[in-house]
Amino acid sequence: MLFSAMKRPVAPAVPIVNGKPDSLAPYRFVKNHFWDDVLFNDDRLLRTPFFESKLDEYFKYYVSAEPDSLIEEVKYMLLMAKTGKEIYPYLLTKFTNKYMAPEFMGQDKVFVYLFENFYAKGDTVILNPASRKTVTERAYSLMANQLGLPAPALDLVDSLGKAVSLYNLPATYTMVVFYDPNCGHCKEELPRLDSFYRAKWKAVGMTMIGVNIYDAEQAAWKKFVVEKNLKNWIHAYQTKAAKEADEKAGRANYRQLYDIYKTPTVYLLDKDKRIIAKQLTIEQFDDIIQVKSKKPTTQ
């Protein structure tokens, strides 16, 4: 059985359907038969030289990178492996590590799915206390900022002490940039973001919001804004009092809600403040904005 499981399906010749070649048929055949003779609850698979590489090949070439497609595959494999004492925790851990910090934007939805449907229902027992804490905290940091969700509320103040609320700023697009004025990478990236804003994004209705994540760095923040000539942005921060009020009330702070673990952290929102994109390069953000701004609007 294990020897049979090693074999990779051989793609058939391209068939002719209704007088036309069906070029996807060989691909579908290989995908549909990729796991023939494999029992996912068989712990012996872990002691073979082929299983992990075959698993990686399958997800790389035969599963769409779209999160919902990944979830269906992961869900099926874990269901089939559930009774395996070794392979089930192996697969759950492998998928967790892969999608906790995914290669492609939006795939962290798979990790959130795993947390909500496996870990939150008792499967944290397979983790040691440190890993359990890491997985739980990471899940809660990602739940609020999934693509398509309304962005978490941001109630801040600007450099003059005037209130700034994300949901009171009408705009076709909003880019929220969380940064540290003393961060070397921020000093490089924010002027580049501003260049794209001036050259392209302002014309399609973009509002830029720069959020200083360190309330104690007032002088450095104001100096940064002036030196980098970011005069067309809205600049704001959360006061120490507001931060303490969140802590006292047991509310998640915006750093957790926006998963800010590095700077700059950038989000692109639509007119309803739903998350369109996050954690991309400036060029990737620009590609998305150009595509979306050229689409006809629906009434």
Please annotate each region the language model reported:
Residues 178-180, 211-214, 238-240:
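Active-site-proximal beta-strand/loop segments in catalytic clefts of secreted hydrolases
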Residues 164-193, 207-209:
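Short active-site neighborhood of thiol/selenol oxidoreductases, capturing the structured segment around
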Residues 188-228, 243-251:
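Structural microenvironment flanking redox-active thiols in thiol-disulfide oxidoreductases
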Residues 1-159:
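Oxidative protein folding and maturation machinery
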Residues 243-290:
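Thiol/disulfide oxidoreductase modules built on the thioredoxin-like
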Residues 235-239, 279:
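Short acidic-hydrophobic, aromatic-tinged amphipathic segments that line or gate anion-handling sites
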Residues 150, 172, 261-263:
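Short, small/polar residue-rich loop motifs at catalytic or cofactor-binding pockets
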